[in-house]
Design a protein with these regions (language model features):
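Active-site rim/loop-helix segments in enzyme catalytic domains that contact anionic ligands
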Residues: 6-118
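Metal-dependent de-N-acetylase/amidase catalytic core
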Residues: 3-19, 90, 101-172
């Protein structure tokens, strides 16, 4: 009986996954959607591929004695505070670097594992074309690819496959 109850609870859970190229992207590109869906009862998880430590932290780099680790720590705290302010369920950091963002097969499989774990009702990521930031375009491509892999019965067949959640694309 307990198992059946647990299964029912899991199927009624509403969740969403935000795939963000840089730690600050989710805040101003889909922060309103995150806050709204949390309020509607969704568990919104954010996954940041990088901290934006090279290309999106100019003010920090202008400070004396700045190091890559200090920038990453600062950006992580900022993103965690933003996620908390939006009432996000969880935030994850893959620390893949940026400018350029590079997402290899191992990192893609980590994203697939996260997608399968969350089983999102919908996903959000960057728009398909951003002439000013190729990291964002790569994130879109990877979001589409990892969603596809998460749906494949032959990829780690012992795991629960993903249904077919809609992928919404955001930009300011």
């Amino acid at each position: 009986i307990f198992f059946k109850t647990e299964s029912i609870i899991m199927t009624n859970k509403k969740s969403a996954l935000i795939l963000s190229a840089h730690a600050a992207d989710f805040v101003w590109r889909c922060g309103g959607a995150i806050a709204l869906h949390q309020k509607l009862g969704y568990e919104v998880t954010i996954a940041c591929m990088s901290y934006g430590e090279r290309g999106e932290s100019a003010k920090l780099w202008k400070q004396d004695g700045m190091t890559i680790e200090k920038v990453k720590n600062n950006r992580r705290k900022e993103a965690e505070n933003a996620a908390k302010a939006l009432n996000a369920h969880d935030i994850n950091f893959l620390d893949l670097g940026d400018y350029p963002l590079e997402i290899d097969k191992e990192a893609k499989y980590k994203i697939v594992d996260l997608i399968r774990k969350i089983q999102p009702n919908f996903m959000m990521s960057h728009s398909k074309y951003d002439q000013y930031n190729t990291d964002h375009m790569l994130m879109t491509k990877v979001a589409i690819e990892t969603r596809m892999i998460a749906q494949a019965w032959g990829h780690n067949p012992e795991e629960k496959v993903l249904g077919a959640p809609q992928l919404y694309l955001f930009e300011p």
